Structures are given as C-alpha cells and as structure tokens.
Amino acid sequence: MQVVKIPTESIQLKDRVVPKHVVIFKDTVVFIGTEPQCHRFVFYMEDAPDEFILERAKLIK
C-alpha cells in the first residue's frame, strides 16, 4: 500500500483546506482522505487479508 498526494484536489476541513491523499493497493484506490487519515488506514490494514482491503474499494464508489 502506498499513500499518494493528489495535487489538484483538496479537502475542506473545519478551519482549513488540505490536499487530498489516496491509498493505492494493487493499482486500486482503497481509501481517500487527508494524509494522516491515509497513514492511519495503512497502519491498521497492514496485516489484513488482501480481499478485505480490496473490499474497501467497493465502498467508496
């Protein structure tokens, strides 16, 4: 899994605008969020089975 910054898109938080990041796993976007959210997702999913991680991709579409 790798975290990739999307330079042309941003996320509006309560007090500021931050760049959008995505987590890519096996050429599939499995999570969209801020950089800390994406790193947290990678941390919690590092020992999860591949099928479970790819199932997350279906939830964001």
Each PLM stretch: what is its role?
Residues M1-V22, D47, E51-K61:
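Short N-terminal "domain-start" leader segments
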Residues P19, D27-T28:
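Beta-strand-connecting loop/turn residues
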Residues I24-F25, F31-R56:
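A short, charged, amphipathic alpha-helix used as a generic interaction element across diverse proteins
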